[in-house]
């Protein structure tokens, strides 16, 4: 009798049955993948031992592409086809993309999300991000030696619904099952809190390549509660590069509009190196020759750089003050400030943070890796690999208010910002005119009072409202936000019971058909392999059928009449004629025809075998 193994819900019954899940930090500049191995989270390196994957994709002719370090090396020589900092474009229309003026790309003004024309066709940010995620997925599967059950992917806390949905779509294209979208500051807090057994109020200051987040968290006995979140999804280290880029050109008397795309990318790469050098030196030199022959030689001091980027530093402090205000705490209440993101290595940032909070920031964890490590811990837990010490709870928040448009273009907030998720809130509305039988529901996200100043997420209609006098109908609108921060909206007229709903998929220009097509395109090689396998299986079955038929005819051909034998021979010849071809359907059809055509022959052979076996035996011997 077999014994059933019984384990606690959510726990793996045995170590060898551990389900493999990873945490992925999909960054603007670099991306990482991490996993928990032997109860310790660690970042997974590539075959060369490098843990950082540059978030760069270069497109080549005929579907070729380069991803990561190899693509980054060619960014200056092939800037139009080498996409960098794509995270800044996720879920964004062309008008919303800041810094696009200095980007060397040919933008396509598609509805919703901006797209980029390359030598391999027009690419959306979702497709580009999917290439990066797929590369990390392959790295993880190679490192861990098996397929993944899923991944926790981090996003800036201030990403709105459109940007979050775009990230999930990219993961889907990359063949990843998303266990959770986790806010980056929260992931950092998990890694820091579990590593240091920290308790109290903490601020997570997260300045990446393209986004800024500030979260206030309360850590108490394994409970990670986000009290407030603020940020700017269009502010990051790239903006510091552009400030330095503009200064260098101004000093040289060069108009950025006159630069070739190759020179733009070359200069941006060089000023980034210059910026990083200024993190450890009082001054640094720039020496670069442009394609026009112009030779730029400049020395930039740290003081000059600090002066240039001071407005950007102040832009990070504005949402910081707002988050503290929302959490109803002061800088003096904060026990520690955790720095996240490569841009926080700049002394100008560390000095500003220390001055504002009145204490030096915590830097004992690598700011480039801490988010991925926290995501790996959460992924391991969600995959069911609960172990000793994993009794912790994560309470995250929604960063921007969700509301509905009311008469006059006003916004009625249903779920205020910094509400703990998952959450559901409802509010009742009524009709505006006598006899009104339908209501248009416009879902928006933002903090402003006017719809025009907020981001439109979705529209749908509730029809079938019974005709009544204005104000008599009662329409209950329910907003429901899941643990990923994604929204569903339901509307119900209370008297008649008519209802309508929408799962918000923001109109950033990527419909389900588009996603399906991308999936189809991305799996072309796999489909070709599957077709080849199906063809070979059909050929093998055809060969088996022909051999079996030939052997049967040789052994018992006398069981068939002349016309029956001719029919079997004809069916076998027909199968033999197509068996080595490449038409799988034709081979399968001919194989089935021969099988059906020899059914009676097989039955006669069976009868003959039975008679032979029973011949000369008495009934009581059987």
Curated annotation (Swiss-Prot):
Keywords carried by this UniProt record: ATP-binding, Chaperone, Nucleotide-binding
Superkingdom of source: Bacteria
Family matches, as Pfam families: HSP70
GO MF annotation, one: ATP binding
Gene3D superfamilies membership: 1.20.1270.10, 3.30.420.40, Actin, Chain A, domain 4, Substrate Binding Domain Of DNAk, Chain A, domain 1
Role summary: Chaperone involved in the maturation of iron-sulfur cluster-containing proteins. Has a low intrinsic ATPase activity which is markedly stimulated by HscB.
Family of the protein in this entry: Belongs to the heat shock protein 70 family.
Protein name according to UniProt: Chaperone protein HscA homolog
Lineage: Bacteria, Pseudomonadati, Pseudomonadota, Betaproteobacteria, Burkholderiales
Gene: hscA
